[in-house]
C-alpha cells in the first residue's frame, strides 16, 4: 500500500487525484483531532474526505474506509460514509489502531464479509476507540 502524508484539511481535495491512480480497497484517513467543547478540530475535514472517497467508490464493500483520530466525532464520520471511525469514546487512540484495523480487514478473504466486532477487537483501544458503521 501507498502512504501519502497529507494534512487533514487537504485530504478531501487530494483524494480525487490519487484514488484513481492507486485504486485501493482500503483507505485510512487519519491525522490529529482534539475535542474543543462540543466539536472536534478536524472531524468535519475527515467527513469531507470520506464523502470525496465515496464519490470515487460508493460501495462500502469495495472500498473500506477508516477515518478519524483522537477525540474525533465517530458518529459524524460514519454518517459521512466511513466503514470504521474513531473515537466514539472521545479518547486518544493508539497510533497503531488504524494500522491494526487495516491489517485485520485486509486479512479477510475476497468475497467474505468483514465482521466489524472481530476487526475492532484487533485494535488496542477496542470499541471505546473505534466504531463500525451499522450493517
Language-model segments: which ranges?
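Proline-aspartate-enriched helix->loop->beta-strand connector
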Residues: 19-29, 82
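Metallocofactor- and cofactor-centric catalytic cores in central/energy metabolism, strongly enriched
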Residues: 1-6, 14-15, 19
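Catalytic cores of nucleophile-dependent amide-cleaving enzymes
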Residues: 48-93
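Well-ordered alpha-helical segments embedded in enzymatic catalytic cores
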Residues: 13-14, 45, 49
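Glycine-rich phosphate-binding "P-loop"
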Residues: 29-43
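Short hydrophobic alpha-helical runs that function as membrane-insertion/retention elements
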Residues: 1-5, 28, 84-87
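Short acidic active-site motifs
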Residues: 11-15, 73
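C-terminal functional extensions of proteins
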Residues: 89-135
Amino acid at each position: 500500500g501507498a502512504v501519502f502524508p497529507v494534512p487533514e484539511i487537504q485530504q478531501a481535495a487530494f483524494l480525487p487525484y490519487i484514488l484513481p491512480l492507486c485504486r485501493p480497497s482500503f483507505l485510512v484517513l487519519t491525522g490529529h483531532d482534539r475535542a474543543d467543547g462540543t466539536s472536534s478540530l478536524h472531524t468535519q475535514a475527515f467527513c469531507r474526505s470520506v464523502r470525496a472517497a465515496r464519490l470515487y467508490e460508493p460501495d462500502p464493500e469495495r472500498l473500506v474506509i477508516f477515518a478519524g483520530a483522537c477525540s474525533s466525532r465517530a458518529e459524524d464520520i460514519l454518517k459521512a460514509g466511513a466503514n470504521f471511525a474513531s473515537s466514539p469514546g472521545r479518547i486518544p487512540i493508539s497510533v497503531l489502531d488504524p494500522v491494526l484495523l487495516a491489517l485485520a480487514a485486509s486479512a479477510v478473504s475476497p468475497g467474505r464479509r468483514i465482521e466489524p466486532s472481530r476487526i475492532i477487537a484487533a485494535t488496542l483501544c477496542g470499541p471505546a476507540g473505534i466504531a463500525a458503521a451499522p450493517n
